[in-house]
């Protein structure tokens, strides 16, 4: 960690352009920092490969600068995620004594959905997150990703990413960290 303006971006690009010399993925917390990485490549002689600098996840290049969200966006729903989330929620209802068995827990959820859709949706969202977190903690973080994030990762793998630069990584939450560990393994 160094103060703003101390040259971290330029140092990172130097390591990539002059030492590593492999396709790189730069991940940043926002689009302003993402664009900064691409813009600073103009300070280096890329031997005519300047056109291969990208900020578009659909067109990765020798250096692809993206936001963390482009490769870590979680899935929001889907039958399989919802099924597991509802099962987890039902187990909690039984543990807390709000339902006697699995069938009555499912009936409780259905009644809530019919009578208070907004609260039901809020609770389901909470249990989806718990399921995603549990999968990520147990080595299945890639399963938790939205289809667009998975597609972005596949395209990045095809260009042969040899270096991942994490800008502002000290701000990363556990979700991103777990996923990025698996992303590195996926690229290897």
What are these regions (language model features)?
Residues 1-188:
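N-terminal helicase ATP-binding lobe
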